[in-house]
Amino acid sequence: MLVPLSLLQKFFSSPLSIEEILQACDRIGIEAECSNVFPDSLNTVVTGKILSASPHPDAERLTVAIVFDGKGERQIICGAPNCRAGIIVPIALPGAKLRNASGEITTIKKAKVRGLESQGMCCGADELGFPHLQKAERGIFEFPADTPLGESACMLLAGAPLECSLTPNLGHCASLLGLAREISFLSPVSLNIPEEFSFASLPQETSICDMHDAGACPIFYSVKISGLSCRRSPEYLQAALTALGQKPLNAIVDITNYVMLSLGQPLHAYDSQAVEQKSLHAATLQSAQPLTLLNQETYTLPAGSLVVADQHNILGLAGVMGSAASSCSENTTEIILEAAYFQPQAVRKYQRTIQLHTEAAYRFTRGVDPQGVLPVLHAAIHMIQSLFPDAQISPIQKIGDDSFSPLSLSVRPKTIKRLLDIEFSTAEIVAKLSSLGFQTAVEEQAVRVEVPSYRHDIQEETDLVEEICRTTPFVQKTQKILPTYTPIYSLKRELTAFLANGGLQQFFTYSLLDTEVSSLSLQESSLIPVQNSSWKLRDSLLPGMLKSAATNLHRQAPYVYAFEIGNVYSKEQNRYQEEERVAILLSRQVMDDSWQGKTPLSFYTIKGWVEKLLCQSGASIEDFSLQPSQHPNFHPYQQAALYQKKHLLGIFGTLHPQLCRKAQIKHDVVFAELSLNVLLSLKKKSGPHYVPYPIYPASSRDITITIDRDLPADLVRRELLSFESKWLESVHIVSVYQGRDSASQSKNVSLRMVFRDHERTLSGQEIEEEYERLTALLDKKLANIGQGNS
């Protein structure tokens, strides 16, 4: 964004230096750079006021002008037809170098013209390198009457080249007013609204339109203005627009562009001859329709697009660009000026679909000030009246509700302490947020904050903490050495090294999936495609990994052993979630050419990798339980879900044959996907450690118990391990038997209990007594679902 310093300074109560402005931009979070693009010789072209102008005694086409250049008076002989007393013009002092019409450079010197000395030159815009600002007739350039004297004329014409790069969250700074407001909060000056944007409120009429989409456009204003002409803008307005990076067109369009760039609210002027019944509203298209816009390109607007229309015709794509049919031409004498608040998500939805980027869309997609729509419209009307004193203004038509309920948030000192490691009292919090334009009120152990209407980037408590942070000098911030790695990063490094050393290749796949890749999943995603396109965020690492595996296998890779660590996305209860996961994919035979024959991959192959992954993560396998799973991407009888209490760690097993056929893979594929966050929460601080071999023998006893067929056998094993016993070392499942009778509702589970004391050898009687005690506890525990006996 181009920001002319000369225009920006108008919004301050007193001037700021370039250094002060750049420092404030740094604190706001804006990357700003200012460089002088003019040669040094043009720095001697300054603004001066013609005090008197009299005809040359020896040349009827020349004028003798007495000019004050801010330091003193000087005599200049001028041949421009518009040279007259009272105007402020560019003055080239002796030593300045100007390029003439033929391209030759001329050095300005003191000289005698027809016997009278000329101590400089009054310049036109074309002579300074701004030919587009020059009027059709030749003449010297005229500055506004309030232009300071002795200032660099080129800097005023082009506006010192301050270039600002705005991040997406700083949409409220995408105007001179927005940027000046933020700078004033962090500088010793106050905000000042220039007189050219002052206005008097005009009468309003509320209209009701059944076709208006109040959801996508809460408030819509329009006003009819007649008695106009699309002549060229005054030179000062052309200069200001050029400095802001816009090409001047005509007075009406230039005013709407200038007001938008200055105040941040896009406006649009329609030729009223193209508007039926002189009435506009915002409507949503029910079906796709073509529309030719101002750039003379025809676009197919998708269904759901928000448009500005009259009773029968589409006159513009709301928040993006008007139609060619309703544009202002040299014959336009009456316009309908529109100002509205379009919801950012509504504009963003179709603006990206048709790939049309405009200054208006840039602002609407980031959010404009809903309470600034009417004041900006009044300011534009005021500027039109100043250029066209005979213009007739009709009452403003309002559609929708202009009431506004500010977002209310609370910020707590303990949250600031946790995030910034700085302690602030409630009084300090109130002072800092109040200085940034927030309305505050002290509550118990918190500060209640009302967010201004223009701050769309403030949505939660952490955003307010960020505001407090940027008003806090670095010297107040705690200085401490950050940890080398975060725990999650360290875990990812460990797992990456472990899996790579185990012979697995690391995959890196895209988070955005197209239609082809996203089809490699039989699970329906809760995420919708991005902006009505075919791309959507992945909710699993499987589709991308399966596509990459298929590509490598089709290129005759002997096998694919791969893993990936990445983010997946989901939507639960209208909230979007992001989670990091680790996934393993194995495909084809393990030993294809071995003399032993083919050893196919199976459920137990991937189960072994999952167990090794848990051990490497520092988690105990005993902390987890396997439970039946019915995930559509896996074989219905070869999959399992891994739980830690009630927390799902992940799912693993053999992929569904239908999914393999979709990917055109002829061999079985086994896959596992685990949550890194759950793994991290279970990681033991001590990590793996050495355990010596026992020196005393163990004794085992078997038990067979009958339970309901739907209960997992591992449930019995875990129940036994849950009983307090100083000798029970481990419990293993020996077998699970279910009769051939399909009507049977029970199954037999055989388990082996291992007993050991690490300080002595247990006697047979001690083992039997402990065995009987544990089986009795188990029978009692499972009394409602089955009976067990040894």
Swiss-Prot record:
Mg(2+) binds at residues 457, 463, 466-467. The keyword Magnesium applies. Binds 2 magnesium ions per tetramer. Transmembrane segments: none annotated. Keywords: Aminoacyl-tRNA synthetase, ATP-binding, Cytoplasm, Ligase, Magnesium, Metal-binding, Nucleotide-binding, Protein biosynthesis, RNA-binding, tRNA-binding. The keyword tRNA-binding applies. It is an enzyme of class 6 (ligase). Residues 404-483 form the B5 domain. One of its GO terms (molecular function) is tRNA binding. Belongs to the phenylalanyl-tRNA synthetase beta subunit family. Type 1 subfamily. NCBIfam families: pheT_bact. This is Phenylalanine--tRNA ligase beta subunit. The gene is pheT.
